[in-house]
Amino acid sequence: MASKAPRPPEAIAAIATAPGRGGIGVVRVSGAGLTGFAQQLCGREPQPRLATLARFRDADGATIDEGILLYFPAPASFTGEDVLELQGHGGPVVMQMLLARCLALGARLAEPGEFTRRAFLNGKLDLAQAEAVADLIEASTAAAARSALRSLSGQFSEEVLRIRDALIDLRMLVEATIDFPEEEVEFLDKGRALPRLAAIRTQLDALLDRARQGALLRTGMNVVLVGRPNVGKSSLLNQLAGEDRAIVTDVAGTTRDALREAIQIEGIPLHVIDTAGLRQTSDVVERIGIERTWREVERADVVLRVIDSEGAEEDALEAELAARCPSAAARITVVNKIDLLGLAPERTETAGAVRLRLSARSGDGVDLLRTELLRAAGWHAHGEDVVLARERHLLALREALDHLAAAEAAASALELFAEELRLAQEALAGITGEFSADDLLGEIFSRFCIGK
């Protein structure tokens, strides 16, 4: 019995531009054989890759809108299928009418990320590049956008594939030595295998470091300001933000709730959180604010404990901070109001404990704090080498490194050595999507915009 021909992909459609009003709105359609679709919609056959002025018509022939029709025939399109882009006036009613007409012609509403998923399934993008599409859209800083664009262009994937290919070459020689022990030719000995393995580990370590920097660009850090009332936390937030975001008064307890401000330092997004001053109080509202302060501390990446240069330090508060802070969080003590004592800005470090002297009022020493925040984040600029990475990429790179370390330990047993190389290769393949479970793909693409 002859096998059935594969069913052509059903057409999908979605509004590709952001909701709201604008000069231009775009409806995107992807599927098979869209020339007939365009003829019914516009009354003419579309010309490939040519911007054509067209009238978009409803089922009765009435004009919905007049705009630009673009047609990209398969496989030379974003999705690898026939793609139509209908550029009309960007009003929400017009866009909905145009989308409804596309659905009436047989397309179905695209799921989130379905256009990009089809591009991945049709080999137009690998999985890391597909994720970079969403990361570029969501980038909150120029540095993050540039890094996402490098990943989208394939730079991250190419480096992963280079390391994977080096692993394959080494595996090939190891397995040939195992499979053909009777051959007079020695394919590989331990003395040559370990230097090659060390070179691969060095490349992978460097890529992981750059990927960590990229992950920082993508997610940023939570920086929480804590301390007693009226020590200058809100003034410090305003200095970091470069504008007056928090109310500053001489009245203790002015800040009752957490105030969040997004700032950038060298392209790194920081989420700085000013909190209610920590003290014993009978005020119900203030107590709620203090409870929220501790909740913010418990999920902080960096805790800035602000103290007054004229005030006494309190061991009890320091002990509670130590108990409540996440173990991985950095803690920095900021001695504020040095202008009142005529002191100079300064950074000191004793047994790993960092202490900064500054004035939030004048701004003296705040640059020391900015530098310290970058240091706490582990940021060291790589210029144009940073690639935007996700947590799953970091996990895969670490897993591959763990297998390479295990391979080195098992170098005397070639079968175990080869197996660890295979597992390292498999971990890297998960980054680009060579080996990816359907549920992982569904999770990744479900986070995209509808029109992507």
Swiss-Prot record:
GTP binds at residues 230-235, 249-255, 274-277, 359-361. K(+) binds at N230, T249, V251, T254. (6S)-5-formyl-5,6,7,8-tetrahydrofolate binds at R28, E85, K124, K452. Mg(2+) binds at S234, T255. Pfam families: MMR_HSR1, MnmE_helical, TrmE_N. It is an enzyme of class 3 (hydrolase). Homodimer. Heterotetramer of two MnmE and two MnmG subunits. PANTHER family: TRNA MODIFICATION GTPASE GTPBP3 (PTHR42714), TRNA MODIFICATION GTPASE GTPBP3, MITOCHONDRIAL (PTHR42714:SF2). Exhibits a very high intrinsic GTPase hydrolysis rate. Involved in the addition of a carboxymethylaminomethyl (cmnm) group at the wobble position (U34) of certain tRNAs, forming tRNA-cmnm(5)s(2)U34. This is tRNA modification GTPase MnmE.
